[in-house]
């Protein structure tokens, strides 16, 4: 029997879109803008791939995409706070980038977008990481999880206007609003590649933990969410499903015969009623799949144990409540009860209102502009942030908590040790090497500390070894 993890290590990786609009005739490609964005990081750390003071990773991914990977978190609201802190960190870098460009006589604006597709049809991701027990075979885990992941865009998609282009995955669909940004950009269910085939679940096994006990489930099908309540629903519902799978809860067999065709069709159906073919014969709707998982989660929450660690039942009760309310809206066709809490609904309400007022068709560039500006992480400029200020989009996390999360690592996971080391390293002239499981002071008379357990915030041995490393950092390099 598997262990049920009500305290589970989770993390979110977000790739941001980057673009600039310059005052001069000069144009900067995304690569150049990204280099300017990361210049202060490279100046200070001699690398564009670093760990930030808060234990999270800040780096420039392939294809000029700035990326933020949260430190290890072990509860839901903590994860949402650290995800949001990444936006704040990158917004500050963008402001600095604009100042640098102005000093060089290249005035203009730098835009960082927390979305998943650009105007050229490229896609970039929001990847969710969950530590899961090896007691559950991957095949069984995937079989139960895939139908949930394919259909959960109903409840947590970010929404987008899809305009078909030749050779693109959407070429056979007419223009229109979609529930999900990523649904047109995944090509298979389970795979070990991330970019070439872009699966729903990635199986490349680097658990960053004891590989005999754990595997890291890497989910790459999700949309990046602006809404904190939608992020909490996306991750919280997945946490509940994983707990139920580990507990051996009898979940219905919804193995789909073609996940990829299904995911694209679901994205264009606001009733959730498109029939999907099942592998064992018969059909089922996306709404019915989500309703079954939701009903199971309601029952599970009634018996879910608590020990004061991990995600409390109160946070998951809010998740289950919102989950149910969104599904009820699919039944009635009226989404106004959740139009401040779910990204795709918030965005669609805005686009519909502007389109109606100006009598605009769905392919009008003014609507495309709204679609993009919704995801601008600049709090003074981004449409989502404007809606928050106007009371038209809910928040979950105290802004002070988000700001604190830009400086301090999560106190309840291994990241706490990394955070202490990183703060000491900031004051030091010595070179260091840091990754998820290792802290190292380089050079002669250096030292290293291995941290294989992501749940461990310290021990007498770790604390002593960290103190030794901190002492080394206080010395001048040999």
Where are these regions (language model features)?
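Terminal catalytic/cofactor-binding subdomain
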Residues: 1-113, 145-157, 189-201, 206-478
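Internal, well-ordered domain-core segments that constitute the primary functional module
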Residues: 108-192
